[in-house]
Design a protein with these regions (language model features):
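Ankyrin repeat boundary/linker residues
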Residues: 53, 86-87
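Start-of-repeat signature of ankyrin repeats
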Residues: 23, 56, 89-90, 117, ...
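Peripheral terminal and inter-domain segments
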Residues: 167, 171-275
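N-terminal segments that cap or nucleate solenoid repeat domains
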Residues: 20-55, 59, 132-136
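Ankyrin repeat structural motif
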Residues: 35-43, 68-76, 102-110, 129-137, ...
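Ankyrin repeat A-helix N-terminal signature
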Residues: 29-34, 62-68, 96-102, 123-129, ...
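Ankyrin-repeat inter-repeat connecting loop/turn
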Residues: 49, 82, 116-117, 143-144
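Noncatalytic, solvent-exposed loop/strand surfaces
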Residues: 269-719
C-alpha cells in the first residue's frame, strides 16, 4: 500500500526542469506496455506527446506496433503526429501498425490523416481486407501506380469483389513503357536488407530486368512505370527510389510482404557463383602439413581470438551419417550457442536446460526481432569432456532458477563461450548475472553476481535477445564486456578471487554482442572492444586509449589482429565498415569526411562489413563471411578486394565464425555444413562436410581434434 501511494504521488508531480528525459521515457514505457492510465496522467502533466527516442520513435509508434488501440486514440487526441517516422529505419507509424497486423489501428490512423495510403492499399489487396481498402481510398492520397499494382495483386488472388472495386477507381493503364536500356543497367546490381539478411540480385537479360531473391528461382519483370516493375509469374513487384542518377533503395513486394533493400557497395563480380549452383570440389589435394606441439583453444575463437590452428592436424573431410572421421559424439541436453574450448585432454562446454521445455529455435536469414517467451525454471551447466573419447569427465550444475531476460529465437540462455588458462575455467551467464570460476577438476573456486545483463534490440528496450559476449582471461584478469539496454560497462575481475579490479563505464553504448580482444604486440597491450563506437582500453587499468567511429548500430563481430594491425567489422546500418587500425595511437581516431585512411587507420571501407561471423586474417588475407555465405577476400595490407564468392555456391545461413588451419579455411553454416576452402588469392572448394544438425557455435581445434558443437551434441572429428 505504501509503495502504491508513493508511486501515485510521484506520478502526480509536475514535470520539472531537468526531468524531461525521464518523463519522456516514462511515457514511452507506458505506451509500450499498454498502461492507459499512466499515459493519460503523463499527458495531463504536460509531457510532450511526441517525445522521441534517440531513433525518433514516438509513443504513438510503440502503441501502434503493440496494438494498444485505446492508447493510440489517447495520443492522437493529445496531438500526436500520425505521420511520424523513425530516423533509423524510416518506418512510419502506419507501417508499424500494418506490419504487426493491427488493422483496426491502421484504419484509425488513415482516418486521422495518415498519408501513407499507398502502403495500406497494397496491404489490403494482399490480405483481402475490404475495410482497410476503403479506408485507404477514402483518404484521397492513393496514387495511380499503387492502384494499378493493387489491381494486379487482387487479380492474382482471384478476389473478384476487390478487383471490381479497384477497377472502378483505377485510371486506365498507360501503355507498357519502353524503358531505356541504360536505365535498366542503372537498376542492375545487388541489393541487401540487413534487417532481413536477404539479398536481391538484379540483372539485365535480353533487355529484360530479371531478379533472384536469395534462394528463389529467377523472376522476369515487366515495367509498370519508369521506376516500378511486376513479375507476371507470381505478382512480385519491385520499385526503385532514384536520387539524382543513383538508386537509393528498392522496395520489393512478394508473397504479401514488402521490404526495402539498399545497394551493396558494388555489384557482385562475375566471379560470384549464382545461388543454387553448387561449386565443384577441387581434386587437387593440399600437401600434408606437419604437426607441431599441441596448442590449446582457450576461449572464444581460440588463441588471441585469431581462429587459427596451424599444425594441429585439423581434418579436411568427415560425414556424421557414415561415421567418416567421427571420433566421438556426445549428447548434451538443453540449448546453447556457446562454443567449445579445449585445454589438454579436456573440452569444456556450457548449456542451459529449460524446465518448461521450450526449445523454440529458428535458423536462417530473417528479420524477426521477437523474443522467446520462456522464463520457466532453468538449470545452467558446465561440462568437461574427454578430448579423445568424448566421455563426460564431470558436470556441474552452476545455477537453478528463472532467467531474468528472454532470448532471441536464434539465441540461447547460454550464449557466452567459457574461457580457460589451464588452471581456471570461467563461464558467464548473462540472464542470471552470474560469473563462475572452477578449476579443471570441477571444484568451484568462486562465483560473482554482476547483475542481470539485459541485452536486446536498441530500437525497443522491451525486446530482449540475451547477452552473448564471452569472457576473456588476460594476465590474471577476467575481462567482461557488458553492453546492455542500460548502464553498459567493461570490467576486469581478479582471476583468483572474482574481486572487481577495475570498471570502465560505457555510458553512451547500447547493447552489443561482441567479445573483446587484447592486442599484444610491439606497441603494448590494448583491450579492443567493438560497439557503436569502437574503443581501446589499457587492459591493466581500464583507462580508455582511443575511440573510432562511425560504426554499425549492432556490433557482434570480435576484433582480431595480425602483424600489428587490428581488424574490426560490423554489418548493420547506418554503416557497415571494415577498419584496419594501427595500434599505439591515442584519442579520437575517427576519419575526416571522405577519408579512408590516416596515420592510425591503415585502410577502411564503410560498406561491406559483415554482421554475425567474426572475420579471419590468415596468410596475408582478410576473409569476411556474410550471414548469407558471401565470402570476400581482401589483401590484408591494402584492403584491396581479391575476390568475392558464394561459399559452396549454394548460399545457406552463417552465424559461426570461420577457423583456419594448415592452408585451409573452415566455414560452418547453421544447417550443419562445413565448407573447406583453400586459403589464398583464388577461391577453391576442397570439401563439404555435414553433421546434419544446427550449428551456431565456432569450431575448436587442438592436437588432432576438431570439435563441433551442435544444438544437441558435441562432435570430435579426427583423421
Amino acid at each position: 500500500m505504501v509503495r502504491m501511494t508513493i508511486a501515485m504521488l510521484l506520478l502526480a508531480l509536475p514535470v520539472a526542469a531537468g526531468q524531461g528525459d525521464a518523463s519522456a521515457d516514462a511515457l514511452q514505457e507506458a505506451a509500450r506496455r499498454g498502461d492507459l492510465a499512466r499515459v493519460e496522467a503523463l499527458l495531463d502533466q504536460g509531457v510532450q506527446v511526441d517525445a522521441a527516442t534517440r531513433y525518433g520513435t514516438t509513443p504513438l509508434f510503440f502503441a501502434a506496433a503493440r496494438g494498444h488501440a485505446a492508447i493510440v486514440r489517447a495520443l492522437v487526441e493529445g496531438g500526436a503526429d500520425v505521420n511520424a517516422a523513425d530516423t533509423f529505419y524510416g518506418t512510419t507509424v502506419l507501417r508499424r501498425a500494418l506490419g504487426n497486423r493491427n488493422v483496426e489501428i491502421a484504419r484509425y490512423l488513415l482516418e486521422q490523416g495518415a498519408t501513407d495510403a499507398d502502403r495500406a492499399l497494397l496491404v489490403a489487396a494482399r490480405r483481402g481486407d475490404r475495410a482497410l481498402l476503403e479506408a485507404a481510398i477514402a483518404t484521397g492520397h492513393v496514387h495511380a501506380d499503387a492502384l494499378a499494382e493493387a489491381l494486379v495483386v487482387a487479380g492474382d488472388r482471384n478476389d473478384s469483389a476487390m478487383t471490381d472495386r479497384l477497377g472502378d477507381v483505377t485510371p486506365a493503364p498507360p501503355p507498357v513503357p519502353q524503358i531505356d536500356i541504360n536505365r535498366l543497367f542503372l537498376y542492375a546490381g545487388s541489393y541487401t536488407n540487413d534487417f532481413l539478411r536477404r539479398v536481391v540480385e538484379l540483372r539485365v537479360v535480353d533487355r529484360t530486368l530479371v531478379a533472384r531473391v536469395s534462394d528463389t528461382s529467377m523472376l522476369s519483370f515487366t515495367p509498370l512505370t519508369d521506376t516500378s516493375f511486376v513479375a507476371e509469374s507470381d505478382g512480385t513487384t519491385v520499385s526503385f527510389d532514384i536520387r539524382g542518377s543513383m538508386v537509393n533503395r528498392i522496395e520489393l513486394t512478394r508473397n504479401g510482404e514488402s521490404a526495402f533493400y539498399r545497394p551493396t557497395a558494388e555489384t557482385e563480380s562475375r566471379e560470384v557463383a549464382p545461388v543454387g549452383e553448387a561449386d565443384p570440389i577441387s581434386r587437387v589435394a593440399l600437401p600434408a602439413a606437419p604437426r607441431t606441439a599441441p596448442s590449446p583453444w582457450p576461449g572464444f575463437r581460440g588463441p588471441s581470438a585469431s581462429g587459427v590452428a596451424d599444425g594441429q592436424g585439423a581434418a579436411t573431410t568427415w560425414d556424421a551419417e557414415t561415421g567418416e572421421n567421427i571420433a566421438w559424439k556426445t549428447s548434451i541436453p538443453g540449448l546453447a550457442n556457446s562454443a567449445p574450448v579445449i585445454w589438454g585432454d579436456q573440452v569444456f562446454v556450457t548449456t542451459a536446460v529449460s524446465g518448461g521445455g521450450d526449445d523454440t529455435f529458428r535458423v536462417g536469414q530473417y528479420g524477426d526481432t521477437a523474443s522467446v517467451d520462456d522464463l520457466s525454471p532453468h538449470s545452467w551447466h558446465l561440462y568437461s569432456l574427454d578430448r579423445l573419447s568424448g566421455a563426460i569427465r564431470w558436470e556441474r550444475v552452476v545455477h537453478e532458477g528463472r532467467p531474468q531476460t528472454k532470448r532471441h529465437q536464434k539465441a540461447s540462455q547460454a550464449n557466452s563461450t567459457p574461457a580457460t588458462d589451464g588452471e581456471h575455467v570461467v563461464a558467464v551467464f548473462g540472464a542470471i548475472g552470474l560469473v563462475v570460476c572452477y578449476d579443471l577438476d570441477g571444484t568451484l573456486l568462486w562465483e560473482v553476481d554482476v547483475g542481470v545483463l539485459d541485452s536486446g534490440w536498441f530500437f525497443d528496450p522491451d525486446v530482449q535477445w540475451g547477452h552473448s559476449s564471452s569472457p576473456i582471461i588476460h594476465e590474471g584478469l577476467v575481462i567482461l564486456q557488458a553492453d546492455t539496454q542500460e548502464e553498459s560497462y567493461i570490467a576486469a575481475l581478479d582471476l583468483e578471487s572474482g574481486r572487481e579490479v577495475w570498471r570502465a563505464i560505457r555510458a553512451d553504448e547500447i547493447s552489443t554482442f561482441a567479445t573483446p580482444t587484447v592486442y599484444t604486440g610491439s606497441d603494448g597491450n590494448e583491450l579492443i572492444t567493438n560497439g557503436t563506437t569502437i574503443r581501446a582500453y589499457d587492459p591493466a587499468t581500464g583507462e580508455q586509449l582511443w575511440a573510432l567511429g562511425p560504426n554499425s548500430e549492432l556490433a557482434i563481430a570480435t576484433p582480431i589482429f595480425s602483424d600489428d594491425v587490428i581488424y574490426l567489422t560490423a554489418g548493420y546500418p547506418p554503416v557497415r565498415p571494415v577498419y584496419a587500425v594501427r595500434p599505439g595511437h591515442r584519442g579520437d581516431l575517427s576519419l575526416i569526411d571522405g577519408a579512408t585512411a590516416s596515420d592510425a587507420v591503415a585502410w577502411s571501407t564503410n560498406r561491406g562489413g559483415t554482421y554475425v561471423p567474426t572475420p579471419i586474417v590468415y596468410r596475408g588475407h582478410l576473409y569476411t563471411n556474410a550471414n548469407n555465405g558471401r565470402l570476400t577476400c581482401y589483401d590484408a595490407r591494402t584492403g584491396e578486394i581479391v575476390y568475392r564468392r558464394r561459399i559452396g555456391g549454394v548460399g545457406g545461413s552463417y552465424s559461426a565464425s570461420p577457423v583456419a588451419a594448415d592452408g585451409k579455411l573452415y566455414f560452418t553454416s547453421e544447417e550443419g555444413d562445413t565448407h573447406v576452402v583453400r586459403a589464398g588469392p583464388e577461391y577453391e572448394l576442397l570439401a563439404t562436410n555435414t553433421v546434419g544438425e544446427i550449428v551456431m557455435a565456432n569450431p575448436a581445434v587442438s592436437d588432432g581434434m576438431l570439435v563441433i558443437r551442435t544444438q544437441g551434441h558435441v562432435y570430435g572429428i579426427a583423421e
